[in-house]
Amino acid sequence: NVGKSTLMNVLIGEKLSIITNKAQTTRHRILGILNENDFQIVFSDTPGIIQPAYKLQESMMNFVQTAFQDADVLIYMVEIGEKGLKDEKLFEKIKNTDVPVLLLLNKIDLVEQEEVSIQIEYWKDKVPNAEILPISALNKFNIQEIIDRILELLPVCEPYYEKDAITDKPIRFFVEEKIREKILKHYKKEIPYSVQIEVEEFFEEETIIRIRAIIYVLRESQRGIIIGHKGQGIKRIGTEARRELERF
């Protein structure tokens, strides 16, 4: 959990990407749109880079490849102390790209300044074409510096989206993601990665929005675990997701 989705939410000022302490929380490519009077930045939050082991992960990595093709600036985020490379082929693309690369060294609030300096030198050697920016997404340290540097690197063009847009995803997508976030939060092992959420009904009335969502699982045994004793599990998911959706 390097902090990509946390950064995206901080940059946009809205919680678009769900956040948990589990790996591979992000399944889809999510666009976050930052609008000001004289600029529009479209951020693309992609799944983390991994070696795909099954079809869903292959699809997730396709989102990453698409982002490579579309980007005017590549932002590669690493966690302080991280040294392993998740995908050598993709990493070579980063090192050889013609697009400007910002390498964000996240979670610097967890170590001393001396260690930050060591890490900066390490990544300068690993990715010589990248500009290194030490940040703390959680504590919002150096966030404005990221925006300022991106603006210096972006081409001048007409905005892609309306000025009041913050994402390209429909509201149903975020309903499904909020429910999935609560499952990731409360369940362990394979269950969080074995579910799919589908919003079946979405009715906007004058004072309330009525939503009916289905949670699909791979095996019958997982159904009982999700529901919980006397329905307490599914009730907790519904209550927490509902509260967050009301704020959203």
Summary of predicted features, one role per range:
Residues 1-69, 73, 214-216:
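Conserved G1/Walker A P-loop phosphate-binding module
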Residues 3, 142, 233:
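Conserved glycine(s) of the Walker
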Residues 10, 14, 33-37, 49-52, ...:
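Conserved, well-folded catalytic cores of nucleic-acid-processing
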Residues 26, 49-51, 83-84, 111-112, ...:
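Catalytic P-loop NTPase motifs of RecA-like helicase/translocase cores
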Residues 30, 64, 106, 146, ...:
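Residue-level signal for inorganic ion chemistry
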Residues 35-40, 59-132, 203-208:
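Conserved C-terminal guanine-recognition region of P-loop GTPase G domains, centered on the G4
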Residues 99-102, 109-171:
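Canonical P-loop GTPase G-domain recognition
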Residues 171-248:
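P-loop NTP-binding site
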